[in-house]
Regions:
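Macromolecular interaction modules
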Residues: 1-98
Length: 98
């Protein structure tokens, strides 16, 4: 069963700085995660949106997701979060595609 990891980011204090690091550094790291099938980044719209960006990472199975996120590439991606986000500004969720 296909699964995802979703990262929801709150509005950053400095959009330009956030986006520069996110798209130039973080997403290239994400794309190196073993087993990753696809990554999509969406920007929320509307003035009352609860989040700023959402990243959806797709994997073929829970096992591939776990292995990918536990890999050195997955750990490097996780370690990079502190370079553009605070712990309270990102929410992580895991889903199964139905």
């Amino acid at each position: 069963m296909a699964v995802t990891m979703i990262a929801l980011y709150k509005e950053p204090a400095d959009r330009e700085k956030f986006e520069q690091h996110y798209f130039d550094t973080h997403i290239p790291l994400v794309k190196k995660i073993p087993g990753l099938q696809k990554v999509e980044v969406s920007r929320f719209t509307g003035k009352d949106a609860p989040y700023y960006l959402m990243a959806t990472l797709y994997f073929n199975s829970k096992e591939e997701r776990k292995a990918g996120l536990s890999s050195p590439e997955g750990q490097a991606t996780n370690a990079d979060l502190v370079n553009f986000a605070t712990p309270d500004s990102v929410t992580i969720a895991f889903t199964e595609i139905v």
